[in-house]
């Protein structure tokens, strides 16, 4: 019930119920594709280094990058010593998907009316997955749900109702937390290597290697089961 204290009445929300009729079956399915919007466009290492040199010279300071550095960034000839990373493009998917299915059956006889529904939702996250992982580095959410509403006409004035509902929710998250996306947005493109020549992950103090965070930080996987039952008795008191 919404708006109990309002001046214009209330809004009463009730669950769907069966009706006296032949069985009516309804199946609905949807498949959607989602893409992120308003992602920042990052400079490449060459433009970043060139503009940083220009900014330093504008305030009378010595440029940070030499002509050799600029040439290495421009040509990409030495990716380990002069990396050029596009964290957002490399680590986020362009498109992710969501599936949703819902099946309902309703009907009834003069004695019993029924409404039965089942649903399934699967929504995938936006992070890339990698072959060197022994777990899924992406995030996802799954939900399986069911509902059964039964109304029995015990007598002409007595209705006995049973409402059963349940759902299973499954969540999978990588363990990098909010630092992961912050690193993608804030780190300069030449700040670190994803992977060093010896196979170790690149990194510096006070910085998160977003590739390593996705690949090796681990994951959280949780399941939640919910079941609800409501029993009702409606007796008309006609005198």
Language model features: what each stretch is:
Residues 2-234, 238:
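Membrane-proximal, glycine/serine-rich, low-complexity loop/turn segments characteristic
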